[in-house]
Amino acid sequence: MQINKFLLFFLSILILTSCSKNVVEDSVLKEKSLDLQVLEAYQEGKEYLENGDPLFAAKKFNEAEILFPQSEWAPKSALMAAYSYYSYDYLKDAIAELDRFLKIYPKYKNLDYVYYLLGISFYEQIVDEKKDLQSIIKAKQYFEKV
């Protein structure tokens, strides 16, 4: 009797598992490669910047940097994000992005451009040279590094 119950249990499990499908569906559309995603995000950022939307441009450039942080596109994307902010007078955002850039990529080959952009961002923040010297001093420091 014990053997019959075991056999009945085993057969029922066997029948139930044989009825289930384990089909892997192949999609016609494959996932995009990471390189392609980085390039697309970078291109979208350029398009947003050309169309006058610096915030979405910076967001796309940052997305490109995040997707592939060890690629050659990462520092370019971070720099373009900072330029996006600068080009539409979001100077504090540009400065923050450039400071972050200097911390992450201290040996980047075009650091002179980063220092120039930092200097010009501080220079353009000068409202009254008699009241606030902080922007003048910072601009001078960064221009001296160029």
Features from the language model and the residues they span:
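Sec-dependent bacterial lipoprotein signal peptides
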Residues: 1-19
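Acidic, polar-rich low-complexity tracts and alpha-helical solenoid repeat scaffolds
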Residues: 18-146
